[in-house]
């Protein structure tokens, strides 16, 4: 190529790069120039901006000699929407064949495969890009892909999730001011939380990463997936006010995505049904309730009543039977409560298994049991003992509605004694988390 031609090609590429950068800036900073009310138009506006950009790129290219970089930029422009583009796949595949060291083309091609649902090929692209050059985009994308790879065993999936956290941390280390890296680290911790028995320390790390994403990058606050994923964690931790707020914000930012609205509605219905059942004690008639409570026996405490109870630290201890009304917020160590089930409530998500417990004429308490298999449950009239109950008082206000109740959180059915009997290990399952894979 002659010097003049080289200069011309360089000038063309600079112009193309500028057009593509402007297109991505339009998409990523959309809510800095538009209000949340315009959220429903965003996809259409981005599509129109993409078409305009492609037209301008054609004019700039003219009869200039096409090379890998130009193919990559055109493929990247086509890849700006959330949808899979076959044309982008063709252009980017050509670009990496012409210039295998072109890391950005590998990253873009990986994203195309990701949108196509071909997770294995996406993984190959991002891993391949990292062999050419360590870069934060490949690390971010690899972190996402690892959590979606098909595996033959739970152990293999756990290894992928741990690796996903590692890659996200590396991305953060490369640029601590990149909000996307922090957001992806939050998602990796979210998966780890559900994959390793819901350790509160890990949920705190997820929430901190999401907060950091918003702190370093204003655009992160406009990401509906961040709000939905954080709300999922809040819901599981029974911070219902924050969960409702998150679902509502995600729905406002992406009105055409039905999931946030559905999740907000489901949670509101759950809280409404729960508070109604708690107030009416499961609609149990006073005479029936007296008869149920009269049949409670010390034998119903099982191992919680004979000094055989083993605490989390492994030591055997005697628990003191106390009324529900005397419980303090938090874990009530050295205490056991015993009551009768007056209702149970299942949700579409099946988690938690919720039931109402009474032990006197006092109020009815919600008991929320996590990590249960679908076949497990308790029946109305069952006697249930809960050792070292973890109490929480809820005061929730959302969109003009108030919900107020007290609940006891039980991490596994194995902690409960039902009708004097400890629960079988087959009653326990582990929780999973679902996310919108192509939209991290």
UniProtKB/Swiss-Prot annotation:
Induction profile: Stress-responsive protein. Induced upon UV or ionizing irradiation (at protein level). Induced upon heat-shock stress (at protein level).
Q: Which UniProt keywords apply?
A: Cytoplasm, Cytoplasmic vesicle, DNA damage, DNA repair, Mitochondrion, Nucleus, Phosphoprotein, Repeat, TPR repeat
Matching SUPFAM superfamilies: TPR-like
Annotated motif Nuclear export signal, positions: 13-24
Q: List this protein's GO terms for biological process.
A: cellular response to starvation; DNA damage response; DNA repair; positive regulation of mRNA catabolic process; positive regulation of transcription by RNA polymerase II
Name its cellular compartments: Nucleus; Cytoplasm; Cytoplasmic vesicle; Mitochondrion matrix
Q: Is Nucleus tagged as a keyword?
A: yes
In what tissue types does this protein appear? Expressed in heart, brain, spleen, lung, liver, skeletal muscle, kidney and testis.
Could you tell me which residues the TPR repeats occupy?
7-61, 68-98, 103-130, 136-174, 179-216, 224-253
| Marked site: Mediates interaction with N-terminal MREI motif of beta-tubulin nascent chain | 147, 225, 259
**Residues with the Phosphoserine modification:** 203, 221
Q: What is the effect of changing residue 203 to D?
A: No change in subcellular localization in non-stress conditions. No change in protein accumulation and stability in response to DNA damage
Please describe the post-translational modifications of this protein.
Answer: Phosphorylation by ATM kinase induces nuclear accumulation while interfering with nuclear export, and phosphorylation by CHEK2 kinase enhances nuclear stability.
What GO cellular component term, any one, is given? nucleus
Report residue spans for region: Mediates interaction with 28S rRNA of ribosome-coding tubulin. 285-287
Stored InterPro entries: TPR-like_helical_dom_sf, TPR_rpt, TTC5_OB, TTC5_OB_sf, Ycf3/AcsC/BcsC/TPR_MFPF
Q: Which GO terms describe its molecular function?
A: chromatin binding; DNA binding; ribosome binding
Domains (record comment): The tetratricopep-repeat (TPR) motifs may function as protein interaction domains.
Listed under subunit, the entry gives: Interacts with JMY and p300/EP300; the interaction occurs in the nucleus and augments the association between JMY and p300/EP300 in response to DNA damage. Interacts with PRMT5; the interaction is DNA damage-dependent and promotes PRMT5 interaction with p53/TP53 and subsequent methylation. Forms a complex with HSF1 and p300/EP300; these interactions augment chromatin-bound HSF1 and p300/EP300 histone acetyltransferase activity, resulting in enhanced heat-shock-responsive transcription.
Q: Say what the protein does.
A: Cofactor involved in the regulation of various cellular mechanisms such as actin regulation, autophagy, chromatin regulation and DNA repair. In physiological conditions, interacts with cofactor JMY in the cytoplasm which prevents JMY's actin nucleation activity and ability to activate the Arp2/3 complex. Acts as a negative regulator of nutrient stress-induced autophagy by inhibiting JMY's interaction with MAP1LC3B, thereby preventing autophagosome formation. Involves in tubulin autoregulation by promoting its degradation in response to excess soluble tubulin.
What name does this protein carry?
Tetratricopeptide repeat protein 5
